[in-house]
Amino acid sequence: MRLSPVSLRLSRGPALLALALPLAAALAFSDETLDKVTKSEGYCSRILRAQGTRREGYTEFSLRVEGDPDFYKPGSSYRVTLSAAPPSYFRGFTLIALKENQEGDKEEDHAGTFQIIDEEETQFMSNCPVAVTESTPRRRTRIQVFWIAPPTGTGCVILKASIVQKRIIYFQDEGSLTKKLCEQDPTLDGVTDRPILDCCACGTAKYRLTFYGNWSEKTHPKDYPRRANHWSAIIGGSHSKNYVLWEYGGYASEGVKQVAELGSPVKMEEEIRQQSDEVLTVIKAKAQWPAWQPVNVRAAPSAEFSVDRTRHLMSFLTMMGPSPDWNVGLSAEDLCTKECGWVQKVVQDLIPWDAGTDSGVTYESPNKPTIPQEKIRPLTSLDHPQSPFYDPEGGSITQVARVVIERIARKGEQCNIVPDNVDDIVADLAPEEKDEDDTPETCIYSNWSPWSACSSSTCEKGKRMRQRMLKAQLDLSVPCPDTQDFQPCMGPGCSDEDGSTCTMSEWITWSPCSVSCGMGMRSRERYVKQFPEDGSVCMLPTEETEKCTVNEECSPSSCLVTEWGEWDDCSATCGMGMKKRHRMVKMSPADGSMCKAETSQAEKCMMPECHTIPCLLSPWSEWSDCSVTCGKGMRTRQRMLKSLAELGDCNEDLEQAEKCMLPECPIDCELSEWSQWSECNKSCGKGHMIRTRTIQMEPQFGGVPCPETVQRKKCRTRKCLRSPSVQKLRWREARESRRSEQLREESDGEQFPGCRMRPWTAWSECTKLCGGGIQERYMTVKKRFKSSQFTSCKDKKEIRACNVHPC
């Protein structure tokens, strides 16, 4: 029985991929070929028997992990290839991943996750679900699967392989059929891996980068920003080892800073283009508003780029918005292999990193520049309790995005003689690379049909075709591209395989018997999965019928019914639905009882995949002016709803907002309020008094300068008396002296009419060192006389100016 899932999670402990190759399907070999597979009492038996001597696969067969690493990074994806050197081949195989020094008889002995690449070639074993085996028994020279490395703490993993080549030739585990990988030191996670070898590949390769944003309220519920969540436009490039866009442990450039804080790729693109000698392709893809939507509603953004021998690295980044300065991306991803070829596929799960330019800790923290600037580093779950990724136990952060980089073409003479797979041969045959898919959003198509047989009947270049249907054209003014697609191919006869065979699906279950009693008929169907490569007609049957018996003899209570009618149309026009069929009672039971025969049947039916016509929107308007005339602000743009969706409301955003930055705002001088006027500096005649104010904020960025801080105005008290004679002055002074001496004897404080005062305090310190300040001193009442007719005794205060010289 064939399993449907394309991936299987193994035990949580991180281990490397141990590959073992058992022959699982009974169709693969007869009893004469293999001994019976005995059932193990352990978790997964990997027993494979063949007649003859077991041999070591040192030369003919090899098990290889792409890039030939000695270490694995937990959670990363690795392509694993099992191949035979020509003219050798194999028919049966099994792959399995075991922790080091484990036998595989318990579930916890296994580690990592397998992912099926081609279901026509590989599948999970029905009696050993952690192992991968062949889908159909046939001659082959290579198979490939992905292995997702286990979590941190698993240790080393052994990849093991077992194969059966012919009836009596059997290989397992030894030599080049094993591969040991150990867990990468976690202390190296914070440093970007740098290429250490020069690239030796020839020609150029073209890749497609596809970005899948998985950041949503479901995956990251804490403080998720519902209104403004988005990914900024992707910006990056393919470049040489002499240029670094960004890296862990390095400092963000101004371009990286503007992507991280504002989501603007303009400065970053300018920086990349300035390195024209080191850059081959600038990578750009549109922003995503909101951050996550199902792929059947919005296609994942993608971009194509090329690499060559000197510019074989690629880097990119995109801002996670809103956020202080958080991004995801790849840095210096090497697409060149040690075998002088080009990597076929890279799959990486991404966690956010901090650009080191803003110190905010939540999605919508206010701007708080980091001074001095810090180094780029990955975010962790222990950064801050208010962080949306905080975990007091220090667990790993759930990935927020996944990037897939796939090779789609190669041009020029290639160095590696053996291609990665048949698709690579076809890609090399292509006279020119295809442009990026520019299908308008207003054109709704069905899925592509399978490829036809190759037009060449010999081992020569030919063409094959596939088709799709135009289901809807939402805007008649926008033409829809062709509904046919052609691709180069190689005709049959290029391998040892029989090109005249066709691949069939499994038989579906038998239909119900056509009668409710006695002898009837039933049928089952299958379909052609792959037509013969030589272009011949597939002669294998697609329908079978056989006799069936129900209750053998019809009793007197049995009734006679008609044949089943045709099935009704499916209740759904797309996706899953129900269909019914009916039959009639031709003759009721002879004993007069009710006919118990079934007269209607219902079963599920599957129509083509649903392609809901989306709501039609106008293009985005131009961005509005910044909300401020200086400093940091916001700007917006809008679009209009032209028509509703086919099924329900339109959930697309009609307005977008982003940060904008203008020159710093001028800061005017700020002053305190004026002080009280001081007392007149003359006790009689004309004088002046002053008041002061202090500077609280100096002017900046061209702001209004500070005005005066000291003001003077004239004052006039009583007229001064004419100068008395010298004799009168002496007499008055003597009288005043005697009076003062008398008062000092009566009281230790100064006396005013009706009260006795304490002496003046010392002058306070000046409020400013320059620019005009003030000083104060006080005199307080010590005693009021009851017999006094004066009731105006009050504390007194004097103010005078000080340090009035300019600063």
Curated annotation (Swiss-Prot):
Q: Where is the signal peptide?
A: 1-28
Q: Which residues of this UniProt protein bind Ca(2+)? A: 325, 354, 358
Could you tell me which residues belong to the region Disordered? 732-752
Q: Does the keyword Isomerase apply?
A: no
Q: Which GO terms describe its molecular function?
A: LBD domain binding; metal ion binding
Bias type Basic and acidic residues, positions: 732-746
Q: Where is the Reelin domain?
A: 29-194
- List the keywords (alphabetical): Cell adhesion, Disulfide bond, Extracellular matrix, Glycoprotein, Metal-binding, Repeat, Secreted, Signal
Report the residue ranges that make up the Spondin domain in this protein: 195-388
Intrachain S-S bonds? 44-128, 156-182, 199-336, 200-340, 202-415, 443-480, 454-489, 459-494, 502-538, 513-517, 548-554, 559-595, 570-574, 605-610, 615-650, 626-630, 660-665
Q: Name one GO biological process term.
A: protein processing
Highest taxon in the source lineage: Eukaryota
| Start and end residues of each TSP type-1 domain | 442-495, 501-555, 558-611, 614-666, 668-721, 754-806
Keyword Glycoprotein belongs to the record: yes
State where the protein is found.
Secreted, Extracellular space, Extracellular matrix
Glycan attachment sites = 214, 681
Record-linked NCBIfam families: NF038123_dom (NF038123)
Q: What is the stated purpose of this protein?
A: Cell adhesion protein that promotes the attachment of spinal cord and sensory neuron cells and the outgrowth of neurites in vitro. May contribute to the growth and guidance of axons in both the spinal cord and the PNS.
What do we know about how this protein assembles, alone or with others?
A: Binds to the central extracellular domain of APP and inhibits beta-secretase cleavage of APP.
Q: What is this protein called?
A: Spondin-1
The scientific name of the source species is: Mus musculus (Mouse)
Lineage start: Eukaryota, Metazoa, Chordata, Craniata, Vertebrata
Q: Which gene encodes it?
A: Spon1
